[in-house]
Amino acid sequence: MLRKLKVLLFIPLLFVATACCDRGAEMAKYTIHFDLRKAVKMNLPEFVDSIFVIPLATNDSSLIKNVVGLSFVDSIFYINDNQTNILSFDSKGNFLCSTGKLRGSGPNEYFACIAFNILENGNCEIFDGLKHRLWEYDSNLNYVSSSELPEDVLPASNFLRVSKDICIIEDVNSLKFYSSKEGRVLKMISLPQKKGLPSITRNSGLKKLNDEIYYSLRTPERILFKVDIEKMSLQPYYAFDFGQHNLNLRELPNELPLSFYQNYVMANDGVAFVADKLVSSTMQMLSLIHISEPT
């Protein structure tokens, strides 16, 4: 019979510290153990109170081509559409405004929105990788300020402001700690990616919760890291242990054809591939892909 593909969502409630099979997992503060043989089906009402759909207003100004980023701040949804403009909607889906009219080649106009932040004062900060600038606009889309970015901040796929001075800039191979005051990268951390292995999730690996910053690799790494802003370092925080189903990226061979890495997830029975990791103040959620043995 055909193999059965399982996409599982877990809400772990118990954390037990123990040793695991790779260095990152051994250093993690918490280890969460899963026995995939005992996986049980859960009904959605068991862990959520309600689910509802918010239809977004549709007009010529609010059409969305491709959602590449989403933030929900002070009851307003902000959507990064195809890295070109930011659209905002209220909690009922009513269209508020778009930064599209600010996009261009003029002196106070941005050209590309790789990522954005909504600042504490409600202003929008746009990371423009093509013009090499950080732009700030107020809630009425008026130009506030801009600053030039040095060449070494690129390439970049996302950025997150963690203080008035420090931004974390993410790309495929590194995290860069950038000082707005000094206008330079203070430190760069190389990420333990396996070259060629495809990203399972498109979501940004940077998550901010209660002034803490977490980072998750986009490839199927089973470690969730915590970012130490003062030391500008990554610390293994949660390790997810699937026993015999563990995947250790560091054990994969190097310099094989790209097709090997692209097909690795679907070609390996019995291995649990972590797809995404989320942390909140009340729960920790993990989604994974596991291909069961043939039956």
Functional labels for PLM-detected ranges:
Residues 58-61, 95-120:
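Blade-loop segments of beta-propeller domains
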